[in-house]
Every structure is written in C-alpha cells, then in structure tokens.
Amino acid sequence: MRYSTISSKYVNALLMVGKKVNKIEDYGELLKALCDVYVQFKDFFDNPAVKVWKKVETIKESFGTSIDKVFVNFVSLVFENKRQKFIPQIAAYYRYASIDVENKILVNVTTAEKLSSEELRAISEFVKKCVNRVPVIEEKIDESLIAGAVIEFSGKMIDVSVSGRLNKIAREVFSLRKG
C-alpha cells in the first residue's frame, strides 16, 4: 500500500504541473523514457556512492533538449528522496492517471491479428458514442480468439470473437444436456 501511495504522490504532483504548463502528454513520454533508462542502468542509479547531481546530469545528457526544467526538478526530487526504485511504477501510474485527467478512457482491444486503421477508427467511434469520452486504445494479440475481438472499457466487456461465441454455444449445449 505504501508503494502505491508514494507513486501516486509523485504522479499527482507531476500531473498538476503538467496540466498548468500544458505538457501532460510530454511528461508521460519523458517518464516512459526515464523508466527505460532507469531499468537499463539500475545499478548506476541505485548506487549510493554516486551523487544525486551526477545521476540527474546523466539523465539530462541522455535526454538532450527534450527535457525541460520542470521535469529536471521532478527527477531531482525523486533521486534526492531516494525514490528512484519507484520510477517504473510512477511511469505506469502516470499513464493511467493522465488518461483520466484528460477526460479520456482506456480501451483494451484483444484480437486474433493486428487491426487495420479503419477497424481501429470504427472501434474508437463506437466507444466514443457509448461513453462520450475520447478512447485511448491499447491493442493485444491473442490468436486463440480465432477471429473477431474482445473490447473492454468502463467496466464492460464486449466479446465478439469466434472463440467467445463457440464457448457460449458450448455452455448452452451443456446446460440443455443437464436440464
């Protein structure tokens, strides 16, 4: 529990500032990149012998001009408070929290094969009509679906896959045999 509380405080602070300076999406990308750099060089960043300023300078150098003063201060704060081990969770939580702050909705779409841009647009329009929010689609591939899709959003699951229909038919057949 403490783990998510720590992450959420950093996320909420960065979201608040990001909203004021209109950089919510930019900070999300920077956090994702920071997470990648942290995971790759974890031993360096977790080494207590390396000074905080050196860690922050290393990040600034690796990001180049894409990093602004606000984000540098955020990173400095994370390292000064020795919270760098939470960077992956901060990045993950920020992604979901930023979707909510921007009045969007996360939509998980699982299909047997990659969807075309036209199919994605159709799903996006359908979800937008249902919940009146801009969808952020997260695609997953599951070949066991055979064909069709499973769409999950706002606590709802719409299964229009072949395997889903076959499972439904099987349940109905077995319920008839029992009765």
Swiss-Prot record:
Protein's cellular compartments: Cell inner membrane
Sorted UniProt keywords: ATP synthesis, Cell inner membrane, Cell membrane, CF(1), Hydrogen ion transport, Ion transport, Membrane, Transport
Entries under InterPro entries matching the protein: ATP_synth_OSCP/delta_N_sf, ATPase_OSCP/dsu
Annotated membrane topology: Peripheral membrane protein
SUPFAM superfamilies in UniProt: N-terminal domain of the delta subunit of the F1F0-ATP synthase
GO molecular function: proton-transporting ATP synthase activity, rotational mechanism
Assigned GO CC terms: plasma membrane; proton-transporting ATP synthase complex
The organism's place on the tree of life at top rank: Bacteria
Database matches in Pfam families: OSCP
Principal subcellular localisation of the protein: membrane
Quaternary structure (record): F-type ATPases have 2 components, F(1) - the catalytic core - and F(0) - the membrane proton channel. F(1) has five subunits: alpha(3), beta(3), gamma(1), delta(1), epsilon(1). F(0) has three main subunits: a(1), b(2) and c(10-14). The alpha and beta chains form an alternating ring which encloses part of the gamma chain. F(1) is attached to F(0) by a central stalk formed by the gamma and epsilon chains, while a peripheral stalk is formed by the delta and b chains.
HAMAP family to which the protein is assigned, alphabetical: ATP_synth_delta_bact
Function according to Swiss-Prot or TrEMBL: F(1)F(0) ATP synthase produces ATP from ADP in the presence of a proton or sodium gradient. F-type ATPases consist of two structural domains, F(1) containing the extramembraneous catalytic core and F(0) containing the membrane proton channel, linked together by a central stalk and a peripheral stalk. During catalysis, ATP synthesis in the catalytic domain of F(1) is coupled via a rotary mechanism of the central stalk subunits to proton translocation. This protein is part of the stalk that links CF(0) to CF(1). It either transmits conformational changes from CF(0) to CF(1) or is implicated in proton conduction.
Family: Belongs to the ATPase delta chain family.
This protein's name: ATP synthase subunit delta
Species this protein is from: Thermosipho melanesiensis (strain DSM 12029 / CIP 104789 / BI429)
